[in-house]
Amino acid sequence: MRSQDVLLATAVAVLVISAFCIVFYPRVQDFMVGNSLWNGLAGFSGEYKASCLDSATQLPRLPQGKVLLSIPYLSYTEEELTELKRFVTRGGRLILMDDYGQGNEVLEYLGLQMRFSGKPLLDPLFCYKNPRLPRITDFAPGVRKAGVKSVVFNHATILTNMGAGEVLAWSSDRSFLDLNGDEKWSPAEPKGPFPVAAKLKVGKGEFLLVSDPSILINSMIGKDNNRSFLEYLMGYNIEPGGLLVDRAHLEKTPLDESKLKLARAREIFSHPLPAMGLLALIFGGVARYLLWSKGGKID
C-alpha cells in the first residue's frame, strides 16, 4: 500500500472514530438536556418531551400554549431580549430560574423591579441533609391546591424588590442569606422568610421566577414535591410539544459544542437535497482519487 493510501485511510479512521466518540461520550455539563448524570436534565426533558432552543430568536411566532424555560448563565443579546419580551407579551409563559443573579438583565430589560439576590440562601433547621438544601414549605394557596406541600432547593438564592409580583413560595423564618460565605448566621445577615418563587402578568403572558434551577436536575426532580411544583409552574394548558428549553445561555464544554454541531449537520443532511449533494461530493471525490491513484489524468 502506498504512503498516500495509508495517509488517506488514517485520516478517514480518525474522523470516524472522533465522530463516534463525540456521539457516544456522555454529556457531563450542568443542566444539559442530554446529560443523564446527577446534574443533567435528561430525566426532566424526556418526561415532559421538551424541545431545545439554541437562541431566543428561534422562539415561535405564536407563543400561546408555549412555555420557555431559561437558566441564564450566559448573557443575552439585545435581539434575544427583544424576542423574550415579544414571546411573553404575546401570550407565552417564561420561567426564569437563576441562583447567581445573571437573570437580572432580563428583569431590567422588561422594566420590572424584582431581582435575584445572587447571595446563598441557607436554612439550618428546615433543610434536606444540610443548610444548603433548604426545604420550602410555605406556598401560595394556588400552589398548595396543586398538591405541593414541600420542595427541596439546592444552593438557592432569594428574590428581592417584589413590587407587583405575586409570591408563590417563601423560605422559612429560620433561613438566612449567607453574605460572608461562612455558612453561619451573623447579626448583619438578613433572616427569612424570603420570597423564592413568584409570578406576574406581562402583556398577554406570564413571567415566573424561581431562585434555584437545580430543582430540575436528575438528582433533585424526585425530591419531595419538586415534580408537582414544576408542573404547576409550567401550567396545565401547555400544548403537546410546547415546552421549550433554552440551552443557548448555559455554559458548554467543547464536547457539548461538538455534539451540537453534529446534531445540526445531521438535521441538515436529513433533507433530500443536501443529502444528495453530499453523496455527489463523496462519489466525485472517491472517483477522482481512484483515477489519480491508478495514474489516470485528471483535468
Model-derived features with residue positions:
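Short, surface-exposed patches at the edges or C-terminal ends of soluble domains, predominantly
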Residues: 1-299
